Regions:
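Non-ligating segments of multi-cofactor redox enzymes
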Residues: 1-288, 293-294, 300-371
Length: 371
């Protein structure tokens, strides 16, 4: 397949899955009786209730399924979807990151729209750095905590992080802004604005809420979300390269991928266009060792090369690439951090609860600690 076809296929896939995620997110916020009302309008026998909630995207994350298996010794519903993603990664590399992940698509968009880095600054920003090892330490810490019985993967899993940020912070914040706007339009002396405010509020309220919504920690979640997005202006796809534990897991699996980048150094003119367009800082330039664990399968390098010095082909790996560059102390630090999570989480006094001796229990009832 030609390079431009691969790039367009990736763009179409990214757009589809991002819109699907947003659609299912909005559907999960709609009152269920609204579907009943719409069903009655169209047909008494037609059910417009959606049966594919947004949890489908959570099931696509093998990180969620594996952590649940490790921490609770149970296989969650939809585990096979995550297993399929792992198998696909072994075959084709991190195509989930490049083609499917809605959070990755948002980072890609933020990095792409009016990029603040150009020329030599972009080349420098797209060089592999030691900071890309951090995501492996995060992965180790999360799995170590899961082994100890504390599953904290939901905090940093990209699908969970995106859903939490949008549902608890972004959408409620937009709702507050819209209600202020609608109130201003409704109080206007211009009749057209009055009618428009009523119609817009009827359409928007089911999605953004009929009243102001407040969630504990929403400000922190929203600010953290914006900071992570802003970091893309400094280093493209900062989250994907540096922090994403799912990316680390898929990166480990992609080391044996049979879809590999082939380089023809004789054709290379050192224009560095491949480096400028690389989303994963995977060293695509001929003469450098390709970091397939960091490659996000965006195929930008393949498309950008004017000399056809790069191509993706199916071939058996000559051997396992060296394991990620992680020192023993750093790995040990990740393990210690993960093992410490369950104990640090109980420093608020939950570990030493004492039943109130003044409580009176009915005859035959069990102590509170047994509940």
């Amino acid at each position: 397949m030609k390079a431009k076809h691969l790039v367009w296929a990736r763009r179409i896939s990214q757009t589809f899955f991002l819109l699907l995620f947003l659609f299912l997110l909005i559907e999960s916020r709609l009152p269920q009786d609204i579907f009943v009302d719409y069903s009655l309008v169209f047909s008494a026998e037609q059910d417009l209730t959606l049966h594919q909630p947004v949890k489908f995207f959570f099931e696509l994350s093998p990180l969620v399924g594996l952590s649940s298996l490790v921490s609770g010794y149970q296989i969650i519903n939809g585990f096979l979807w995550g297993a399929g993603v792992l198998i696909l990664t072994v075959l084709l590399g991190r195509v989930f990151c490049g083609f499917v992940c809605p959070f990755g698509t948002i980072h890609h968009l933020v990095s792409w729209v009016k990029p603040s880095l150009k020329g030599d600054r972009m080349v420098k920003a797209n060089q592999k750095t030691r900071s890309q090892r951090i995501k492996y330490f995060v992965l180790i810490a999360l799995f170590a905590g899961a082994v100890m019985g504390l599953n904290m993967v939901g905090l940093l899993d990209p699908i969970s992080f995106l859903f939490r940020s949008l549902a608890l912070s972004v959408l409620p914040g937009v709702g507050v802004g819209l209600r202020v706007l609608f109130d201003a339009m409704a109080s206007s002396d211009v009749k057209v604005f009055n009618y428009l405010s009523f119609g817009a509020e009827v359409m928007a309220s089911p999605v953004f809420g009929y009243s102001d919504q407040a969630f504990q920690g929403a400000w922190f979640i929203g600010v953290l979300f914006l900071i992570i997005l802003f970091l893309n202006r400094i280093r493209p796809r900062f989250w994907c390269r540096t922090l994403c534990p799912l990316g680390a897991l898929l990166g480990l699996c992609s080391r044996v991928s049979i879809l590999r980048l082939e380089k023809d150094q004789d054709k290379c003119t050192n224009c560095q266009l491949c480096v400028k367009s690389c989303q994963g800082a995977a060293s695509p330039m001929p003469g450098e060792k390709w970091e397939n664990a960091e490659c996000l399968a965006c195929f930008n390098c393949f498309h950008a090369c004017p000399e056809n010095a790069l191509s993706f082909k199916f071939s058996w790996p000559p051997g396992l690439n060296p394991r990620p560059d992680m020192g023993r102390r750093a790995v040990l630090g990740g393990l210690v951090a993960g093992v410490s999570f369950p104990f640090l989480g109980r420093l608020d006094g939950q570990l030493s609860k004492v039943s109130d001796p003044r409580l009176i229990r009915p005859p035959g009832s069990l102590p509170e600690d047994d509940f």
